[in-house]
Regions:
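Acidic/His- and Gly-rich active-site-bordering loop/insert found
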Residues: 2-100, 124-128
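Short glycine/serine-rich loop segments
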Residues: 92, 100-102, 133-137
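Glycine/serine-rich anion-binding loops at beta->alpha junctions
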Residues: 97-113
Length: 180
């Protein structure tokens, strides 16, 4: 199994205009990538009364403890006035060594890093103890009603245990780990 390139994957993710709550196909794209790595996947769509439905993705490889989960989101805020951008927000580019595009910082690059790290791990560890999972929501930038909390509740009902979780959210300026 060959390691996925995190920069290439981040660019592919940025091309999806996944403005909350519309996923624009990004969940199916990630699902296909993860299935190729051997993950069992489930797209979970939740709709709370009075809110737009949101797609989330749960992917897991392995069935034993401990379960190490990566958690994050692929939804983005609207790009605003396109004329204010120096590049097209959904056509990723590299400028002065930085990846530019809507969602590059928050948080499609983190999702790409998660998936490429898992692919690198799997390329060196054919058999490992435990499980690796990803919880990817499409409801962090908006009301955050039909996302992470609902997926965690779903997992609890199925007796899925999360032993460790790495959240790649880069944007809380005040306190590390305070937000997702």
């Amino acid at each position: 199994m060959q390691k996925l390139n995190e920069l290439q994957l981040a660019k592919e993710l940025i091309r999806f205009p996944s403005i909350t709550p519309v996923d624009a196909g990004v969940m199916r794209f990630l699902e296909k990538k993860l299935k190729r790595l051997g993950f069992k996947t489930k797209i979970l769509e939740f709709k709370e009364k009075g809110y737009q439905p949101v797609k989330n993705l749960y992917a897991k490889l392995g069935s034993k403890s401990p379960n190490f989960m990566f958690a994050g989101h692929v939804d983005i805020v609207p790009p605003g006035n396109i004329k204010d951008w120096t590049v097209s927000p959904f056509k990723p580019s590299i400028k002065k060594g930085y990846l530019i595009g809507r969602g590059a910082n928050d948080m499609k690059s983190s999702i790409a890093a998660f998936v490429s790290a898992v692919s690198a791990f799997l390329s060196r560890n054919k058999k490992f103890i435990g499980s690796v999972s990803l919880l990817i929501t499409g409801d962090e930038e908006g009301d955050a009603v039909n996302g992470t909390k609902k997926v965690v509740d779903y997992l609890k009902k199925r007796k899925e245990k999360i032993n460790f979780c790495l959240v790649g959210e880069p944007t809380n300026p005040n306190k590390l780990g305070e937000m997702i």
